[in-house]
Amino acid sequence: MSVFLAVDHVHQVFDLPGGGQYIALKDVSLNIRPGEFISLIGHSGCGKSTLLNLIAGLAQPSSGGIILEGRQVTEPGPDRMVVFQNYSLLPWRTVRQNIALAVDSVLHDRNRTERRTIIEETIDLVGLRAAADKYPHEISGGMKQRVAIARGLAIRPKLLLLDEPFGALDALTRGNLQEQLMRICQEAGVTAVMVTHDVDEALLLSDRVVMLTNGPAAQIGQILEVDFPRPRQRLEMMETPHYYDLRNELINFLQQQRRAKRRAKAAAPAPAVAASQQKTVRLGFLPGNDCAPLAIAQELGLFQDLGLSVELQSFLTWEALEDSIRLGQLEGALMMAAQPLAMTMGLGGHRPFAIATPLTVSRNGGAIALSRRYLNAGVRSLEDLCQFLAATPQRLRLAIPDPIAMPALLLRYWLASAGLNPEQDVELVGMSPYEMVEALKAGDIDGFAAGEMRIALAVQAGAAYVLATDLDIWAGHPEKVLGLPEAWLQVNPETAIALCSALLKAGELCDDPRQRDRIVEVLQQPQYLGSAAGTVLQRYFDFGLGDEPTQILRFNQFHVDQANYPNPLEGTWLLTQLCRWGLTPLPKNRQELLDRVYRRDIYEAAIAAVGFPLITPSQRGFELFDAVPFDPDSPLRYLEQFEIKAPIQVAPIPLATSA
């Protein structure tokens, strides 16, 4: 359906009297369809009324825009009508005269008879015929609000804006007016946006409920689709379990935001913190292509230029790296994309340990390789693999670096898309990337999913060929991220910004083909890729099929297309996959978890420090290769459509404290 109203990357900043600024709204985007009823909810100070005023044209956004039917909103207009909590009726005019004032002012191009007809029809529409000639002091509060709504509808607006219209009314009157408003909007075909604190009101009236995060810098945290058919009956809705599922979703979001506000207040650093922030930082990594920005920032002095002394420590396994983080032997690390989420939740029976990621360091860069004997058997595609496995009782033994590693998650997704159950039809073996090539040569495994370094070495040795790259499954996926302990980040935010700034500059160099020789020279040092650097960083990718190597653009992605943005939308997808394969329940408190892990504020400060433009990716979903749409606001619905999955559980997850 076409877009009627678009809120396009809106920022709203207010200057403070004593200097400084207050960021009310930050990068808010929303598309509204014709005839849709949208409710905005969130705690006080989250910018609900600010957003409503921007849509009304009563204020202009600091950046971004409001687009109504293809035209930018720059001022109030008769196509929009605002109904406030206070009725704003003229006390010396009757109900009819208050409505007529709006009609005569706006619809002055209509003749007198037409205007009178509109007034009388509107009086009947809101059920005020008996009170048409009464003055405001002669009618109840509920009737006054109906007059305000009638005045709004009488000018035939395309968009009705309501700012807590029933907040001051008693429960009975409020309930009656809610049902009347629902009927009126449906009969008139009006598009409506309403601010409310009442979750039951939002569910009754809305097609979608937009949940805003805490201010300052409020954003859209989640959008809930209310899929009850219309016309709606309150009691019928409340008798269904689905109603309470939706209600709990709203309340859960608000509770998470309340906890986030308390946590932010408790974690606010003392004014003297900046001067005493740590400048010597130990960072861990596993050698591979993904460590290129880390190596470049270190060897070209980008960390040092920003006053940092960085010590890099390499590890053979992800378990060893995680142990060093937990023991306080590292201040941060180049981590698997899902690792900050997993550590903060305490996956694998570990104690929850809060990790934040302010930067995605690399994207893509992996593949799925099989032993060459399967190439000789004619396995050149996923379909071929399915046919081969159907004809033999053999189960493939496929090595993965870690159950939560992106190569493992993409491998599972890829297999399941063809009807292969990764828990039954193949055997997944956890293995250090260092061991994979030799294990394949020895016949201990039939293939593996890993980064380009291991793939290239296996192909060069004549032991493997590539069946698929991760670009074939999810182009642009997050691969490695900068992970920092939350407790350390709270007292060293400026150091974290400097780390990110250096890595941003390094990522830009790594994505510049003119810098290839320079990068090879750095990475061929023994602590990084060593002698394998020349093979791994060759310009063309060898699939091991006997064909000429192929150039694959963005096989490794370190900078272009907002590659470094720490995207909570991608984090939601990661949570669905961890849940899909039984590694964790789908967290009911996922918004709280995502807000803690994905530190976009640090990223944005680093972007500003480096001077790169701040361009945020879309936050409204995506598809992998199988074209199954992923909606970040409905992760459970996304999971339920897959036939191959572990039993799905949804539960609140106890999160780590910062200490």
Swiss-Prot record:
Its annotated compartments are: Cell inner membrane
Classify the main location: membrane
Which residues hold ATP? 42-49
InterPro entries, A to Z: AAA+_ATPase, ABC_transporter-like_ATP-bd, ABC_transporter-like_CS, ABC_transporter_ATP-bind, NO3_transporter_ATP-bd-like, NrtA/CpmA_ABC-bd_dom, P-loop_NTPase
* Activity regulation text: Transport is inhibited by ammonium. The C-terminal domain of NrtC is involved in the ammonium-promoted inhibition of the nitrate/nitrite transporter.
> How the protein assembles, per its UniProt entry?
The complex is composed of two ATP-binding proteins (NrtC and NrtD), two transmembrane proteins (NrtB) and a solute-binding protein (NrtA).
Entry-linked SMART domains? AAA
Q: Provide this UniProt record's keywords sorted from A to Z.
A: ATP-binding, Cell inner membrane, Cell membrane, Ion transport, Membrane, Nitrate assimilation, Nucleotide-binding, Translocase, Transport
Q: Where is this region: NrtA-like?
A: 279-659
Recorded family membership: Belongs to the ABC transporter superfamily. Nitrate/nitrite/cyanate uptake transporter (NitT) (TC 3.A.1.16) family.
Region Linker, residue ranges: 255-278
Question: GO: which molecular function terms?
Answer: ABC-type nitrate transporter activity; ATP binding; ATP hydrolysis activity
The record's listing under CDD domains reads:
ABC_NrtD_SsuB_transporters, PBP2_NrtA_CpmA_like
Q: Name one GO cellular component term.
A: plasma membrane
Name the Enzyme Commission number(s) assigned to this protein.
7.3.2.4
> Per its database record, what is this protein's job?
Part of the ABC transporter complex NrtABCD involved in nitrate uptake. The complex is probably also involved in nitrite transport. Probably responsible for energy coupling to the transport system.
Residues in ABC transporter domain copies: 5-239
Observed effect of gene inactivation: Mutant is unable to grow on nitrate, but grows normally with nitrite or ammonium as the nitrogen source.
> What is the recorded name of this protein?
Nitrate import ATP-binding protein NrtC
The GO biological-process annotations, alphabetized, read as: nitrate assimilation
List the catalytic activities from the record: nitrate(out) + ATP + H2O = nitrate(in) + ADP + phosphate + H(+)
Q: How does it sit in the membrane?
A: Peripheral membrane protein
Query: Domain description from the entry?
Result: Contains an ATP-binding N-terminal domain and a NrtA-like C-terminal domain, which are connected by a segment containing an abundance of glutamine, alanine and positively charged amino acids. The N-terminal domain is required for activity and the C-terminal domain is involved in regulation of the activity.
